[in-house]
From Swiss-Prot:
This is Ribosomal protein uS12 methylthiotransferase RimO. The keyword rRNA processing does not apply. [4Fe-4S] cluster 2 binds at C171, C175, C178. Residues 157-386 form the Radical SAM core domain. Pfam families: Radical_SAM, TRAM_2, UPF0004. [4Fe-4S] cluster 1 binds at C31, C67, C96. It catalyses: L-aspartate(89)-[ribosomal protein uS12]-hydrogen + (sulfur carrier)-SH + AH2 + 2 S-adenosyl-L-methionine = 3-methylsulfanyl-L-aspartate(89)-[ribosomal protein uS12]-hydrogen + (sulfur carrier)-H + 5'-deoxyadenosine + L-methionine + A + S-adenosyl-L-homocysteine + 2 H(+). InterPro entries: Elp3/MiaA/NifB-like_rSAM, Methylthiotransferase, Methylthiotransferase_CS, Methylthiotransferase_N, Methylthiotransferase_N_sf, NA-bd_OB-fold, Ribosomal_uS12_MeSTrfase_RimO, rSAM. Catalyzes the methylthiolation of an aspartic acid residue of ribosomal protein uS12. SUPFAM superfamilies: Radical SAM enzymes. GO terms for molecular function: 4 iron, 4 sulfur cluster binding; aspartic acid methylthiotransferase activity; metal ion binding; protein methylthiotransferase activity. It is found in: Cytoplasm. Binds 2 [4Fe-4S] clusters. One cluster is coordinated with 3 cysteines and an exchangeable S-adenosyl-L-methionine. The lineage of its organism: Bacteria, Bacillati, Cyanobacteriota, Cyanophyceae, Synechococcales.
């Protein structure tokens, strides 16, 4: 169930208003999967008549949905909590930090009135009621099992025309560097019908781009149907009236020939492959507890390019993993040079307590890991620039999302750009009013390119 009222978010904070005397502010930190949980909590409170604002100055209670994936994310979460505590706010700590540290947070932050785990956010109404009665609440399940569906109220904050849809929760993989299974539990997939129902709800709200997410989207359905079921899901979504469907977190082992064929044949599925490969060298992948990947990565990428020449490839990579030698890093550099990805995100390894990687010998010094990150980014940048430059003179579809009030330019994205992580397309001022184009997918002639972004002009309108 989705609330019908929408307001543009500001600074990643959720905005709601209602007639209820109680005022609750929401602050979201972390990934888009966490964002969906935030939106469900907002929807639940809105359905009960609570007033919710992004303005923490006026709020009696602040719900902070936190991230604890890596140290940098934890530090950001802690800074936000300390800042609110210094203001004397009553705080409800939700999300991964709450799941990670549990009652320790209540002990160390007196202003924390409740902690809500990743599998417990559906109880936010009861938690808030107990807090208002003076209780300090520990609502953290040891093993998260809950997964939200289309029947759980949700208040979207991602704009009127783009929405994430979580197809599964949790993860069954045990990568050596990752703490997510501890924070989110094992994989729990939603049914195809549940996902289609929510997609149809979103289509009625005018959504133009739907982004399917989970920890490993290509493993969708294995726990529910006994085999990977993404191809079946994509074909079921072909009947949903949403022009762009994008898939994030496609692990290579799950991109079977059937899935790649579904990408090709389902008209509203974008040929955009988000592949978190992490590394290329077999020994590093083995140390990461991903030994299966080295046997499929190159062959898979070649197969995708053969079947879908227009495919857009994004990957994320980790440098400085424990024991990574110069030769292994050079192998990764050569891999990036040869594969010519459209978009690459590079991260220096973060040593996380509770992971197998934290115990490994030969930890790479921070300075070396950062230098390797910088070098890999420098290798990828001219590749990304060349990919963009090759589009000059072509006409591409652009989803218009906002207007630059200073220049009059219309700003949006082509299908090759995912929200937040990729580039954007800036179109010179048009005689057509922004309000007439907002949320529409229009043809645009690309006239210029930058490292990550494109510029152009509206070509023609039917």
């Amino acid at each position: 169930m989705h609330t019908s009222v929408f307001k543009e978010p500001k600074n990643n904070d959720a905005v709601l208003s209602n007639h209820c005397n109680a005022s609750v502010a929401f602050l979201h930190l972390g990934c888009e999967k966490n964002l969906v949980d935030t939106e469900h909590m907002m929807g639940l409170l809105a359905s009960e008549g609570y007033g919710v604002s992004s303005n923490t100055d006026d709020a009696e209670v602040v719900v902070v949905n936190t991230c604890s994936f890596i140290e940098q994310a934890r530090e950001e979460s802690v800074r936000a909590l300390v800042g609110l505590a210094d203001q004397g706010k009553e705080i409800i700590i939700a999300g991964c930090l709450a799941q990670h540290f549990k009652s320790e947070l209540l002990e160390s932050i007196p202003e924390a009135k409740a902690i809500v785990g990743t599998g417990d956010y559906q109880n936010i109404i009861e938690v808030l009621q107990r807090v208002r009665q003076g209780e300090r609440v520990n609502q953290v399940s040891e093993n998260p099992k809950f997964v939200g569906d289309e029947n759980l109220p949700r208040y979207r904050t991602t704009g009127r025309f783009v929405s994430y849809l979580k197809v599964a929760e949790g993860c069954n993989y045990r990568c050596a560097f990752c703490i997510i299974p501890t924070l989110r539990g094992n994989q729990r997939s939603r049914s195809v019908q549940s996902i289609v129902n929510e997609a149809n709800q979103l289509a009625k709200e005018g959504i133009q781009e739907l982004i399917l997410i989970s920890q490993i989207t290509t493993n969708y359905g294995m726990d529910l149907y006994g085999r990977p079921y993404l191809a079946d899901l994509l074909r079921a979504l072909s009947h949903v009236d949403i022009p762009w469907i994008r898939i994030h977190y496609a692990y290579p082992t799950g991109l079977t020939p059937e899935v790649v064929l579904a990408y090709k044949e389902v008209p509203n599925v974008l040929p955009y492959f988000d592949l978190p490969l992490q590394h290329s060298h077999p020994d590093v992948l083995r140390a990461m507890n991903r030994p299966w990947q080295s046997d499929v990565s190159s062959a898979l990428l070649n197969r995708i390019k053969e079947q879908l020449p227009e495919a857009v490839m994004r990957t994320t990579l980790i440098v400085g993993f424990p024991g990574e030698t110069k030769a292994q890093f050079d192998h990764l550099c050569a891999f990036v040079e040869n594969q010519k990805f459209d978009h690459v995100g590079v991260f220096a390894f973060s040593r996380e307590e509770g992971t197998e990687a934290a115990k490994l010998p030969n930890q790479v010094p921070f300075e070396i890991a950062q230098a390797r990150k910088d070098k890999l980014v420098a290798i990828q940048q001219p590749i990304s620039a060349a990919k963009n430059q090759a589009l000059i003179g072509q006409t591409v579809d652009v989803l218009i999302e906002r207007e630059d009030l200073a220049t009059g330019e219309l700003i949006g994205r082509s299908a090759r750009f995912a929200p937040e992580v990729d580039g954007e397309v800036r179109l010179r001022p048009s005689q057509v009013l922004f309000n007439d184009l907002h949320g529409k997918i229009v043809p645009a002639l690309i006239t210029g390119s930058e490292l990550y972004d494109l510029t152009g002009e509206i070509n023609h309108l039917n």
